[in-house]
Amino acid sequence: AGAAVSESGSWWLLDSNCKLLEETTAEEAKKYPVLSGVVLTAPVSGCAASAADPEQITVAQTLLTAMEQWDLVDVITTVDLSKLYGIVLWYGDRFEIDLGSTDNLAYKIQYLQEILKNLNDGQSGVIDLTFETETVARFLPW
């Protein structure tokens, strides 16, 4: 599974292609990145996930595929897609990763993986990958 998503009190696992794998428990869901801000519509095991905002599914698929490719699925705890102009990932409680808009998401995830390699274990803060002014990441310690 690539991620977990909560729907009306129940939890679903989905793969990186956003296919719903199975319903699961809240405890089991904690083992995967949680997609927050996504409202599933009529989830059915074995079918493609659909959401009230279909673009969220497209964005989730891009992010989950990139996270899988760059070995970040095990360390990202939350993928917040409630605002597609302000996407936020959480690396446990150590890092808030601001991705900004949906532009260049796969590149931003690749860039993130490089940044994480260079941060010390004791560091925590915000990793800004919004690229609002230039294509440069900024680290803002807490």
Predicted segments with their positions:
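Charged, solvent-exposed interaction patches on well-folded alpha/beta domains
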Residues: 1-142
